[in-house]
A protein has these predicted regions:
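N-terminal strand-loop element at the rim of the active site
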Residues: 10-67, 152-158, 167, 241-242
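A conserved mid-protein helix/loop that constitutes part of the nucleotide-sugar donor-binding site
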Residues: 19-24, 201-227, 234, 241-247, ...
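Nucleotide-sugar donor phosphate/pyrophosphate-binding loop at the beta->alpha transition
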Residues: 20-21, 65-72, 110, 120-138
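Membrane-proximal helix-turn-helix segments that form the acceptor-binding/catalytic region
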Residues: 27-31, 129-146
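Donor nucleotide-sugar binding/catalytic pocket of nucleotide-sugar-dependent glycosyltransferases
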Residues: 54-55, 137-187
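Short His-centered aromatic/hydrophobic patch
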Residues: 88-94, 115
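Nucleotide-activated donor-binding/catalytic signature segment of Leloir-type glycosyltransferases, i.e.
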Residues: 247-263
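Aromatic "clamp/platform" in nucleotide-sugar-dependent glycosyltransferases that forms part
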Residues: 264, 283
Length: 294
């Protein structure tokens, strides 16, 4: 049939962002007959429910060359595809597509921006207010709706932004995914694979390894705790954006036996089951999703 399928585009900075937060949304549109497109920096991760993947690098770097390149790429994608809806996530993954859309004549796709925590808030570094605040304020006029996930963001947006503002209570987590039964033998197998013995006290912090998540703080904490609890082990499942810097730090500080860098994992619910305690060291998160998940 020549009935054109409705198309939706999701944008975010990294592939891993989709895996962590957006699978239910991708599935929803796929189940409702949309052709689902995704634009983000390619990390070689298979994204489910995605019909077409564009590799666009919406970096956090304020490098003009990078920004221009991603701007040109996404503008071309928007012109060629006539999306019914564009769902934007992460500051630059949302800013660059909206900027591109604002420069397209007769552009009529709906744009929804989900702010998973604005980078400007009471007590945020001044530089954040100088960069992100004017950017978000300016771009809000090219946005049909902004969805915020906490009160402070909602109130700031209500006062300052030119767009419909909504608030949802957090981004939600999938209960079924975490309400799993893990058999004793599965746990044993996983412990063995991760080289964890029975008397180990296991901490876990799932999340991308980056400066904002501040995992180095946990390594320093382990160094102190190790004196009291020699059998302590920290699991760090997550894509490494610091190019092995943290591993080196662990080695230099004699923590290599106490920290497991697991890379990107799909079995977080199982890993939580073999851990004694979930921890978080993020500098900028309200109620971190990993603490709720545990």
């Amino acid at each position: 049939s020549n009935v054109k399928m409705k198309k939706v585009l999701f944008t975010a900075n990294l592939d891993s962002f989709f895996i962590k937060f957006l699978i239910p949304q991708l599935k929803y549109f796929k189940d409702n007959g949309y052709e689902v497109h995704v634009a983000s920096k390619d990390q070689g991760i298979e994204i489910p429910y995605c019909d077409k993947k564009f590799d666009v690098c919406f970096t956090r770097s304020l490098n003009i060359k990078d920004i221009t390149k991603s701007y040109t790429t996404i503008k071309k994608i928007l012109i060629e595809n006539d999306y019914e809806l564009i769902s934007c996530h992460t500051p630059f993954g949302a800013a660059i597509p909206r900027l591109a859309a604002s420069k397209i004549k007769n552009f009529n796709s709906k744009i929804v921006y989900t702010a998973h925590g604005f980078h400007f808030y009471k007590g945020a570094p001044l530089i954040n207010w100088m960069i992100y605040y004017p950017m978000e304020k300016y771009l809000s006029r090219y946005t049909d709706s902004i969805i915020t996930i906490n009160d402070e963001d909602y109130n700031t947006a209500k006062k300052k932004m030119k767009s419909k503002i909504y608030k949802v209570h957090g981004i939600g987590i999938s209960r079924e995914k975490f309400d799993i039964k893990v058999s004793a033998s599965e746990k044993m197998k996983l412990r063995k694979e991760l080289n964890i013995v029975n008397d180990n006290f296991v901490l876990i912090f799932p999340g991308e390894i980056n400066n904002n998540k501040n995992q180095i703080l946990l390594l320093d904490t382990i160094k102190i705790l190790k004196e009291k609890i020699p059998n302590i082990v920290l699991l760090l499942p997550g894509y490494d954006l610091l190019q092995g810097k943290l591993q080196k730090y662990a080695k230099q500080n004699g923590l290599y036996d106490n920290v497991r860098f697991l890379g990107y994992r799909k079995d977080i619910p199982q890993l939580l089951r073999i851990s004694n305690m979930a921890v978080s060291s993020s500098k900028r998160e309200g109620l971190p999703i990993n603490i709720i998940e545990s």
